Amino acid sequence: MAQGPLKKTKPSTAKRPTALAPKRGPRQIAPKKATLIKQQKITKKLTAGLTAKTERTLAQRAGHLELLAGGKKDKKAEKEKGKEKGGKKN
């Protein structure tokens, strides 16, 4: 049997997210041996060259797409033509 009145429930507070920022990844320990340091420098140089080359090719392809019909330049030209034809109406 119940001994006393039931406890009133308190309104729950809004839950705060435990992680406010993205979780940090594992830290990389720098190599100590001279051969490994040299190897790391070479790989860094090569990967930088590869990324630069891929970015350059992507930029060329994007530029080539603008030359085709329907690019940004064509849309701007069409807007200007529309303004010239319409003019001001009094």
From Swiss-Prot:
Which stretches does UniProt call biased (Basic and acidic residues)? 71-90
The portions of this protein that span the membrane are none
User: Which Pfam families does the record match to this protein?
Assistant: DUF2462
| Family per record | Belongs to the UPF0390 family.
InterPro entries of this UniProt entry? Answer: UPF0390 (IPR019034)
Disordered, as annotated region: 1-37, 61-90
Disulphide-bonded residues: none
Record-given protein name: UPF0390 protein AFUA_1G03640
